[in-house]
Amino acid sequence: MNNLRQRTLTGLGWTGATRLLGQILQLAATVVLARLLSPKEYGLLGMVLVFTGFATYVADMGLGASIIQRSTVSDRHLNSVFWLNVAAGTLLTGLFALAAPLVASFYDEPQLRMLTVVIALNFVFGSLNVVQIALLDKSLNFRTKFWIETVSSLASGIVALTLALAGAGVWSLVGQSLTQTIVRVLMLWAQSSWRPALAFDLSAIRELLHFSGHLLGFGAVIYWSQNIDKLIIGRWIGSSALGIYSLADKLMRLPLYNVTDVTTSVMFPALSTIQDDVEAVRRAYLRAVRMISLITFPMMTALSVLAAPAVLVVYGSKWQASIVILQLLCFSGMAQSIYNTAGWLYLSQGRTDVLFRLGLYSTTVRVTGVLIGAHWGLMGVAWAYVIGGYVFILYPTWSRAGRLVNLSFTSLLRNVEGPFACATTMGAVLWASDRWIFGGWALDARLAIQVALGVIIYAILVRTFRLQAWVEVVHILLARSGGRSRFLRWAAGHEA
């Protein structure tokens, strides 16, 4: 157990560093690209990605996750998964090439025809690394993954900026996507000793599909739950509106990607190794949820309160329409950071059948809400997303997962109430100071001082009230420093 805990913490560190640095590199590229490109050009790519993103779930078929979850896998499984994914990727590329005119017609955007054909090449390239990624994650070898993601993000950003400066418009975003996929594949193959043999065993696929079949179904339905808003905006409101909405959505998801997704990539394989020890799973799960809420709640709160200076400083005045959308989506993001973790329990316990049914339910809620909200434009869609997440999805999704490990919804709320209270207090102080003290300051100075103020206030609050998650994080860092850090001893409430 101690070895697993150590490997999990190491994995969290490397995965966190991977995602953080990757997001910093991508954010830096996006800051420049947003000033060079228009909302319409971002919206055009977003229209295509709605469909290709869905096909990405289908191409993987959940088999990569099945390799991670299965206690033992043989070359028979690995070879079969590899060749099936290559076949699926090639087929999807061909299908999208044929369907490109239909995509362009659906949105009434002729430019989408060639964009769809080129972006679909990602399926062929991406199918070559499914097994290698699964083996890396299964072995908790996140240090190697760090370098792969860092180099691929850096290379793709350079390509995108070069194309944008050359006047390539939306094609600079396409080049960024393809470059990242290709570089990632090359580096994964370079580091992996596993090579596919010319062998395929249908029975091996059937063994894996027992787990991945429902997971594939869940991935498909939850994808539309998370992206139906973009499809409807692109079809009925327009590409410029989709560009505005997509940028706000991307900013909101930065904390989610850097915290929740990072933790998920480590917690799923870690919990799978102790799936038969319900008490151990429950303890590990609650510890992770506490840490997630400790980080995501203040980030979402601060981003919502400081949305105006953040958008105007980082992206420029032509993206001003995304400010209010960002504020609403951040409110939804706090709930997402918690109910998304329910998937760890379903996956680690092998209950993808229940996960699939809940995915159908949440997708129905999202589709219904967004269709109604679209009558009031972007604001209506954003409100539908928020209301659906809190009122109809949070409790049903999580409470069923908690039963798998004898964990009540009330117990979950008790574990996140401290970070929520501290984050809300911090947000109130930031809002008041922005309104009555810093409102007239220059935007960049206003943003910088408010971010610093938010960090200080939140740190004081969590230390003063000794939140359990705060103490756990500090003790982990203190142990890793050998107890020598006076600051960490103070943060933990010990005498310096």
Residue ranges and their predicted role:
Residues R113-A120, I148-S193, E207-G213, F218, ...:
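Hydrophobic alpha-helical transmembrane segments
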Residues R5, S66-D75, V124-I148, A166, ...:
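Membrane-interface junctions at transmembrane-helix termini in multi-pass inner-membrane proteins
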